[in-house]
Amino acid sequence: MNSTPSESEKKEQEPSPVEISFLDIYQLIELFVMLLSEQAWRYIGLRVDPRTNKINKDLAKGRVAIDCIISLVDKIGSNLDNAEIERLRRLIADLQINYVEQMK
C-alpha cells in the first residue's frame, strides 16, 4: 500500500486561501492587523517562526509592526463596535508590554 498522499488528497489538506476580493476595506485592514500582530509576536521573540522553527528576534521590526497596528486601529476605530475596539486595544497593550519586557 502506498503511503504517500495523492494529488487530490494533498489539495484537500491545503488550507483554502481567503478570498480577499469580497472583503470591504475595514475587513481588509482588520486582516492586516492580525497578520501584523502575528509578525510582531515573532519579531519580539515570543513565537516561533513557522518557516524555520526557531525564534528570530528582531525588536526593531517588532516595533515597526506594533506601530503599524496602532496606526491602522486608529484609522478604523470609528467604524468598529466597542467590543472590537476594546479587543484591538488589548492586543496593542499586550504587544507593547511584551515588547518592553523583551527589551530588558
Language-model region placement:
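A charge-rich, low-complexity, intrinsically flexible signal that marks solvent-exposed coils, linkers
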Residues: 2-104
